[in-house]
Design a protein with these regions (language model features):
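Bacterial N-terminal signal peptides that target proteins for export
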Residues: 1-9
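Short, well-ordered alpha-helical segments enriched in acidic and aromatic residues
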Residues: 43-56, 60
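Extracytoplasmic/periplasmic/luminal assembly and interaction segments
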Residues: 58-84
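Short, low-complexity, disordered segments immediately C-terminal to signal peptides
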Residues: 26-37
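Surface-exposed, charged secondary-structure patches
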Residues: 74-117
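Short beta-strand edge/turn micro-motifs at domain boundaries
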Residues: 22-23, 100, 117-145
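Second-shell loop/turn segments in exported
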Residues: 38, 55-61, 112
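C-terminal motif of bacterial Sec signal peptides marking the signal peptidase cleavage site
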Residues: 17-20
Length: 145
Protein backbone atom coordinates (compact mmCIF):
# COMPACT_ATOMS: atom_id res chain seq x y z
CA UNK A 1 0.00 0.00 0.00
CA UNK A 2 1.14 3.50 -0.75
CA UNK A 3 1.78 5.74 2.26
CA UNK A 4 -0.83 8.28 1.10
CA UNK A 5 -3.50 5.58 0.82
CA UNK A 6 -2.66 4.30 4.32
CA UNK A 7 -2.83 7.84 5.65
CA UNK A 8 -6.22 8.33 3.96
CA UNK A 9 -7.51 5.05 5.48
CA UNK A 10 -6.29 6.15 8.90
CA UNK A 11 -8.12 9.48 8.55
CA UNK A 12 -11.34 7.70 7.53
CA UNK A 13 -11.13 5.34 10.52
CA UNK A 14 -10.45 8.24 12.91
CA UNK A 15 -13.33 10.25 11.45
CA UNK A 16 -15.70 7.30 11.81
CA UNK A 17 -14.57 6.82 15.41
CA UNK A 18 -15.14 10.48 16.20
CA UNK A 19 -18.66 10.34 14.74
CA UNK A 20 -19.41 7.14 16.67
CA UNK A 21 -18.29 8.72 19.95
CA UNK A 22 -20.46 11.80 19.48
CA UNK A 23 -23.11 12.11 22.17
CA UNK A 24 -26.12 14.34 21.80
CA UNK A 25 -26.02 17.08 24.48
CA UNK A 26 -28.52 16.66 27.32
CA UNK A 27 -30.10 20.05 26.59
CA UNK A 28 -30.91 18.90 23.04
CA UNK A 29 -32.44 15.65 24.32
CA UNK A 30 -34.61 17.55 26.81
CA UNK A 31 -35.71 19.99 24.12
CA UNK A 32 -36.63 17.00 21.92
CA UNK A 33 -38.63 15.48 24.80
CA UNK A 34 -40.53 18.75 25.27
CA UNK A 35 -41.27 18.89 21.54
CA UNK A 36 -42.44 15.26 21.65
CA UNK A 37 -44.77 16.07 24.57
CA UNK A 38 -46.26 18.99 22.61
CA UNK A 39 -46.74 16.71 19.59
CA UNK A 40 -48.42 14.08 21.80
CA UNK A 41 -50.80 16.80 23.02
CA UNK A 42 -51.55 17.84 19.43
CA UNK A 43 -52.28 14.20 18.59
CA UNK A 44 -54.30 13.74 21.81
CA UNK A 45 -52.05 10.73 22.53
CA UNK A 46 -52.10 10.04 26.27
CA UNK A 47 -49.56 7.21 26.22
CA UNK A 48 -47.03 9.22 24.17
CA UNK A 49 -47.32 12.12 26.61
CA UNK A 50 -47.12 9.87 29.68
CA UNK A 51 -43.97 8.30 28.23
CA UNK A 52 -42.21 11.66 28.78
CA UNK A 53 -43.20 11.76 32.47
CA UNK A 54 -41.81 9.78 35.40
CA UNK A 55 -44.08 7.51 37.42
CA UNK A 56 -43.78 9.88 40.38
CA UNK A 57 -44.51 13.00 38.30
CA UNK A 58 -45.80 15.91 40.40
CA UNK A 59 -47.82 18.56 38.58
CA UNK A 60 -48.49 21.89 40.27
CA UNK A 61 -47.64 20.75 43.78
CA UNK A 62 -49.74 17.57 43.76
CA UNK A 63 -52.67 18.92 41.74
CA UNK A 64 -52.02 16.51 38.84
CA UNK A 65 -50.19 13.21 38.56
CA UNK A 66 -48.94 11.39 35.48
CA UNK A 67 -52.15 9.33 35.57
CA UNK A 68 -54.35 12.46 35.86
CA UNK A 69 -52.74 14.02 32.79
CA UNK A 70 -53.08 10.76 30.86
CA UNK A 71 -56.74 10.47 31.85
CA UNK A 72 -57.42 14.05 30.76
CA UNK A 73 -55.99 13.34 27.30
CA UNK A 74 -57.83 10.01 27.08
CA UNK A 75 -61.11 11.74 27.90
CA UNK A 76 -60.44 14.39 25.25
CA UNK A 77 -59.64 11.64 22.74
CA UNK A 78 -62.80 9.66 23.53
CA UNK A 79 -64.86 12.81 23.03
CA UNK A 80 -63.23 13.56 19.68
CA UNK A 81 -61.56 16.73 20.96
CA UNK A 82 -58.69 18.33 19.10
CA UNK A 83 -55.91 20.01 21.06
CA UNK A 84 -53.08 22.27 19.99
CA UNK A 85 -49.97 23.16 21.98
CA UNK A 86 -47.75 25.93 20.62
CA UNK A 87 -44.46 26.27 22.47
CA UNK A 88 -42.63 29.52 23.03
CA UNK A 89 -38.85 29.69 23.47
CA UNK A 90 -37.46 27.01 25.80
CA UNK A 91 -34.76 27.97 28.32
CA UNK A 92 -32.88 25.00 29.81
CA UNK A 93 -30.57 25.28 32.83
CA UNK A 94 -28.51 22.53 34.47
CA UNK A 95 -28.96 21.89 38.20
CA UNK A 96 -26.40 19.26 39.12
CA UNK A 97 -27.36 16.07 37.30
CA UNK A 98 -30.85 17.39 36.61
CA UNK A 99 -32.22 20.18 34.44
CA UNK A 100 -34.95 22.80 34.66
CA UNK A 101 -36.70 23.97 31.49
CA UNK A 102 -38.85 27.11 31.35
CA UNK A 103 -41.15 28.03 28.49
CA UNK A 104 -44.58 29.32 27.59
CA UNK A 105 -47.22 27.23 25.88
CA UNK A 106 -50.42 28.34 24.21
CA UNK A 107 -53.19 25.74 24.44
CA UNK A 108 -56.27 25.70 22.24
CA UNK A 109 -58.90 23.09 21.49
CA UNK A 110 -61.61 22.31 18.98
CA UNK A 111 -64.20 23.50 21.48
CA UNK A 112 -66.22 20.26 21.68
CA UNK A 113 -65.55 19.39 25.31
CA UNK A 114 -62.94 21.93 26.36
CA UNK A 115 -63.09 25.70 25.77
CA UNK A 116 -61.55 26.81 22.46
CA UNK A 117 -59.08 29.13 24.18
CA UNK A 118 -57.50 27.22 27.04
CA UNK A 119 -54.93 29.94 27.60
CA UNK A 120 -51.29 30.86 27.64
CA UNK A 121 -49.26 29.25 30.41
CA UNK A 122 -45.84 29.89 31.88
CA UNK A 123 -44.36 26.46 32.57
CA UNK A 124 -41.38 25.33 34.64
CA UNK A 125 -40.42 21.67 34.25
CA UNK A 126 -37.84 19.57 36.10
CA UNK A 127 -36.02 16.76 34.27
CA UNK A 128 -33.92 13.78 35.29
CA UNK A 129 -32.27 10.97 33.39
CA UNK A 130 -34.15 7.67 33.34
CA UNK A 131 -31.86 5.16 31.66
CA UNK A 132 -31.00 6.68 28.29
CA UNK A 133 -33.99 9.05 28.25
CA UNK A 134 -34.80 12.31 30.00
CA UNK A 135 -38.17 12.37 31.73
CA UNK A 136 -40.05 15.17 33.43
CA UNK A 137 -40.56 14.51 37.14
CA UNK A 138 -42.17 17.80 38.09
CA UNK A 139 -43.89 20.80 36.56
CA UNK A 140 -45.61 23.97 37.64
CA UNK A 141 -47.71 26.15 35.41
CA UNK A 142 -49.59 29.42 35.78
CA UNK A 143 -52.05 30.88 33.33
CA UNK A 144 -50.79 34.18 31.93
CA UNK A 145 -53.87 35.48 30.09
Amino acid sequence: MKPTFRFFCLLVVLAMGAVGCHRTPDEVLIRQAIDAAALATDQVDASALAERLTGDFDGNGGAMSRQDIGNLLRMASFRGETLHAVLGPVDIEPHGERYVANFTVTLTSGGKWLPEQLGIYKVETAWRRDGRDWRCYGATWTQQF
